[in-house]
């Protein structure tokens, strides 16, 4: 039995979000051996237990208070929320933050030779999906009547098998759709991974641990989105150079040995530094321009 004094986090055992969830926890300094095929893994350096489960089980585990936190795709979370509301339940949870991975879109797709002019083209159509409530929510708003064909996998083969006229499924590149004679016609939901917390009172020690974890996650995400920039620049062009780096804090200016009119600049930029920007920096007299990744960051 799990020790209820330890923080319990549910994450996908395998699949699209599993590797990135593991990487996030590792970069937050949580030491967990996730190589073995265990349903429960224990952190070595923090009172944290990881439950490795199917992704569609995670929202329910959080909403039912079985675990304290869950890392889950917003599409799966929203489908579970709509399902429970349809059953007359009042599910409760908190979204702590959206994460910077797991991006996908839930889309409608029809056969390549179909005439699609908008959602109304699907009036009275039979649509195969693993997300019946998200599909219904979207088409109800469009005033479209339809019949749902619930499939838990291989949704894209439904039209060829004669099970459906169209599908509603997750799309990344669209290659799978094309291979099955389908084309994406409408995006109905865009999703990323998110971190959610159960409703209800949380023991103080657990809440403090959650706060520490959130600070680390924020630092990891900021580090991914930021770059450390070092360059040499003419003293009289500093303001122009800083203006080219939106999102950058005021730079650290250091004297450059043997050069009275040039300085070394160090700064953190939260913006991607494109080649065009570097060329503009060089045109302003900057040299020795280095753009480095940041592993950890805390403000």
Curated annotation (Swiss-Prot):
One of its GO terms (cellular component) is cytoplasm. It comes from the Bacteria. Pathway: Amino-acid biosynthesis; L-histidine biosynthesis; L-histidine from 5-phospho-alpha-D-ribose 1-diphosphate: step 1/9. Feedback inhibited by histidine. One of its GO terms (biological process) is L-histidine biosynthetic process. Equilibrium between an active dimeric form, an inactive hexameric form and higher aggregates. Interconversion between the various forms is largely reversible and is influenced by the natural substrates and inhibitors of the enzyme. This is ATP phosphoribosyltransferase. It comes from Serratia proteamaculans (strain 568).
């Amino acid at each position: 039995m799990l020790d209820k004094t330890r923080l319990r986090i549910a994450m996908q055992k395998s699949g699209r979000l599993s590797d990135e969830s593991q990487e996030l926890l590792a970069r937050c300094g949580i030491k967990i051996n996730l190589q073995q095929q265990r349903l429960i893994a224990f952190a070595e350096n923090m009172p944290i237990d990881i439950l490795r489960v199917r992704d569609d089980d995670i929202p329910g585990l959080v909403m039912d208070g079985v675990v304290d936190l869950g890392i889950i795709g917003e599409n799966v979370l929203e489908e579970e929320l709509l399902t429970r509301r349809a059953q007359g339940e009042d599910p409760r949870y908190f979204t702590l933050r959206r994460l910077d991975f797991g991006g996908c879109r839930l889309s409608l797709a029809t056969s390549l030779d179909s005439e699609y002019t908008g959602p109304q083209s699907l009036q009275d159509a039979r649509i195969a999906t693993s997300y019946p409530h998200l599909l219904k929510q979207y088409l109800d708003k469009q005033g479209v009547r339809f019949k749902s064909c619930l499939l838990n996998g291989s949704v894209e083969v439904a039209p060829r098998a004669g099970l459906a006229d169209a599908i509603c499924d997750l799309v990344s590149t669209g290659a799978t759709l094309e291979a099955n004679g389908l084309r994406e016609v409408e995006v109905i939901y865009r999703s990323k991974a998110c971190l959610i917390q159960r409703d209800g009172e949380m023991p103080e020690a657990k809440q403090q641990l959650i706060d520490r974890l959130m600070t680390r996650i924020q630092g990891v995400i900021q580090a991914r989105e930021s770059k450390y920039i070092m360059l040499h620049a003419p003293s009289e062009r500093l303001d122009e150079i800083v203006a080219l780096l939106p999102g950058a804090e005021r730079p650290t200016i250091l004297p450059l040995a043997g050069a009275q009119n040039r300085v070394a600049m160090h700064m953190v930029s939260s913006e991607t530094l494109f080649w065009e920007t570097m060329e503009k920096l060089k045109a302003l007299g900057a040299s020795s321009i280095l753009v480095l990744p940041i592993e950890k960051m805390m403000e």
